Amino acid sequence: MAGNEWINGYLEAILDSHTSSRGAGGGGGGGDPRSPTKAASPRGAHMNFNPSHYFVEEVVKGVDESDLHRTWIKVVATRNARERSTRLENMCWRIWHLARKKKQLELEGIQRISARRKEQEQVRREATEDLAEDLSEGEKGDTIGELAPVETTKKKFQRNFSDLTVWSDDNKEKKLYIVLISVHGLVRGENMELGRDSDTGGQVKYVVELARAMSMMPGVYRVDLFTRQVSSPDVDWSYGEPTEMLCAGSNDGEGMGESGGAYIVRIPCGPRDKYLKKEALWPYLQEFVDGALAHILNMSKALGEQVGNGRPVLPYVIHGHYADAGDVAALLSGALNVPMVLTGHSLGRNKLEQLLKQGRMSKEEIDSTYKIMRRIEGEELALDASELVITSTRQEIDEQWGLYDGFDVKLEKVLRARARRGVSCHGRYMPRMVVIPPGMDFSNVVVHEDIDGDGDVKDDIVGLEGASPKSMPPIWAEVMRFLTNPHKPMILALSRPDPKKNITTLVKAFGECRPLRELANLTLIMGNRDDIDDMSAGNASVLTTVLKLIDKYDLYGSVAFPKHHNQADVPEIYRLAAKMKGVFINPALVEPFGLTLIEAAAHGLPIVATKNGGPVDITNALNNGLLVDPHDQNAIADALLKLVADKNLWQECRRNGLRNIHLYSWPEHCRTYLTRVAGCRLRNPRWLKDTPADAGADEEEFLEDSMDAQDLSLRLSIDGEKSSLNTNDPLWFDPQDQVQKIMNNIKQSSALPPSMSSVAAEGTGSTMNKYPLLRRRRRLFVIAVDCYQDDGRASKKMLQVIQEVFRAVRSDSQMFKISGFTLSTAMPLSETLQLLQLGKIPATDFDALICGSGSEVYYPGTANCMDAEGKLRPDQDYLMHISHRWSHDGARQTIAKLMGAQDGSGDAVEQDVASSNAHCVAFLIKDPQKVKTVDEMRERLRMRGLRCHIMYCRNSTRLQVVPLLASRSQALRYLSVRWGVSVGNMYLITGEHGDTDLEEMLSGLHKTVIVRGVTEKGSEALVRSPGSYKRDDVVPSETPLAAYTTGELKADEIMRALKQVSKTSSGM
């Protein structure tokens, strides 16, 4: 216990406090606190049990030293001896209780992980057995061979990479559009405020540099980095700019258009005037999705005109960074039908386990603070949709992603083996994990080779107070003003003052090692601060502890800790440390990667780093430093002293780092990245070739516009009266201008071509159109009211809502003319049509019917959606769109097995064939008490490699499973992408309760009217299990995009709510 005298004093005070066994603190008696022999007594020797000794042993073994120190300070602050004795007695047992609680939590954590691994093994066996049914005996043996461990990482990498063609200049003719997403933090290209808060750190720097580097690769035309737009007065105005150009890209000067290069695109979501922490952004992510979708569609059209020969250039890949952006990327990828890539950066399950082990917060407190369960679900959803997951290290794959339901290393190998043989995986899928270390921009790195000699930087730093000192970077002077002898080698640490960065242990190691103190200085770059009191509690606590340790060890003149630095100063800080022949250290408890280690190596600095995480791979690749146990301050001090004192070792580590640093360059990273993405199954919407380019569509639109002109000209006043619903809407188009445009088109064409005369003749006597009227709608009213009876049949209230919505919209003739209607329901088409017939509502009054919980989309009144018998058939392009990773039989068999009774009392569900279709497996719920929640079902399906969308619907009487890309909310985005109806121009009419997918529909840029009193109950109770994320993590509690009806179910009340939501949303 050398160097921890205060602990000895604390324990002696406990033992000398003259407490006795009769009190709550029981256990008198003195004795040596360092002797554990009296810590416990055999059972039955109750009078010999000494709780003080037992407490001492428990404290020494299980309580964090810094916490104990703070407690001791509070104790000795009391002057009155009697009060001090009482407080000491109480705290004695309080800390002992906390120590026991911590051990209990550790045991629970071990049991939880053990149970999870056991379940994973069982699931893996079941999945392998299911998959092996259609394999021959030889193939089964090959599959088992796939599960055998590979001898070396290098061999595994070569095997996986051998089938791919490395990206090269041969791809220069390609004009790719790449989308990167990083939602949270403050993101800009210049003067990045890294360290300003916990959301603006290394990830911001990483994504900005990745965007720049990717745009310079051959074949890449444009890179968009999406982030949140922040127009708060608390931050710089630049974060409110919609677009910021990062660089011109590799196509600059080639005359290929004006949109090439790399850009930051800022998308508004949530409160426009507030900068929100990432934990508060979850309810607004769907707004971000809709805003990003609108930009991508506009940009795709513009790029098509520039480099795509008139055909839209959709993103080559959509890449989400962190859990929130992974959630966004999954939805965008599904809406656009393009591949998705994920980089986790920091993972929620790993953080949850670490926080639980610390024992300072319960799981409920952790979730309340960090929204950890919503973050984990975002990561699971991103795994569902990802083609590729990029990690920095092998450790991240094995020890972090392995904790997730959606990834299993062994099952992934089995599925990959089947895919190579062309054998069906029955809808099971695991994303491919690849290690691609982050890159670094070396363009501004200046390495002075003269450091290898005996020269020093005396000329650079001498005479700071002289009349004409040699010019030096300002940050050098800021650092050296702390130091008595600035000529000593510098030990440099650069990180936020976060507890997990372990800065306090570094200061202790430096303070307690006299040879190290005499030989070197310590420089701590701990973010930026103005006032410690204004910092977050965790960061302030770390910084305060550091200052106290500096005072305790009297390190004044040996430790520098400047308050401010900017991004441009960071290379100069590295350069100063290298000139001083110093060492860079990263002592973090766990480091996912360690980008600062790469930066330090590029400037010629040897490194000392934690042995937990990414630094292991970095030191193996660069061979330029030492690894240490971050909990062992003696090991940290020894490693630093070894590098600083041994000149030959220092020079060798420096040379090795500079020689191998090219492995972490951005061009190398991007080349590997594009090679891997090229190996993904690229997909694009099939309908891009079909509409609206064909002649039939042009002719039909011309005729429809002509009829519109005649009709509108009769109904519009000379003043161009506007609809009351759109008075304040910036997206409103003046009908008078629209008429003028149509009349101009008519005048420009003196006569119809012969081929159009027959179409005109048919059009005058028929309501059938070749293409849906959706493509001409300016407004779309989506009725998604889940009104069902106890047996799951639609109630009359659903009909009443439909009729009143029609009356409300028709009351404004201008609005009705430019508006369309869609009915969105969990019912199959047959029951939907029966309901409409019952209410005498023609199906053709709807532009689209979304049926089967989003598994099918129909267009009544559209010729292309009618079969030979005149019956409606679903949109075939939509069915192709959602078929990705879908197996009807695999989902049906697995759900039936999971819902089967374990006690022999009968199954909880039976298949509902009438409600099922090729992309929807429907089950009738027989016993609601036996069914599992959506959370539980999703977890079990993911563990088996099945990626589906699960929902309970129709008053909890049905369980419906549809493809991952299908849902009622995603069907609306499909309509937006397919037919050009802006999501911002959609009005969703729904009830207070509904199916379990209602939450997904309430968020987004569309306007929502919630009709009170029409749904008494829904299926929401089956959404989540206890301990899961909350509804407020999905749906914003307050938003200008939603309004409630207040009175009876009447058209006037619905119109009032529509006007209200239009007015409030227009002010956003």
From Swiss-Prot:
Pathway: Glycan biosynthesis; sucrose biosynthesis; sucrose from D-fructose 6-phosphate and UDP-alpha-D-glucose: step 1/2. Residues 23-32 have a biased composition (Gly residues). SUPFAM superfamilies: UDP-Glycosyltransferase/glycogen phosphorylase (SSF53756). Gene3D superfamilies: 3.90.1070.10, Glycogen Phosphorylase B, HAD superfamily/HAD-like. It comes from the Eukaryota. Activity is regulated by phosphorylation and moderated by concentration of metabolites and light. Keywords: Glycosyltransferase, Transferase. GO terms for biological process: sucrose biosynthetic process. Residues 118-128 have a biased composition (Basic and acidic residues). Pfam families: Glycos_transf_1, GT-B_Sucrose_synth, S6PP. Residues 18-47, 118-139 are annotated as: Disordered. It is an enzyme of class 2 (transferase). Belongs to the glycosyltransferase 1 family. Plays a role in photosynthetic sucrose synthesis by catalyzing the rate-limiting step of sucrose biosynthesis from UDP-glucose and fructose- 6-phosphate. Involved in the regulation of carbon partitioning in the leaves of plants. May regulate the synthesis of sucrose and therefore play a major role as a limiting factor in the export of photoassimilates out of the leaf. Plays a role for sucrose availability that is essential for plant growth and fiber elongation. Homodimer or homotetramer. This is Sucrose-phosphate synthase. It comes from Zea mays (Maize).
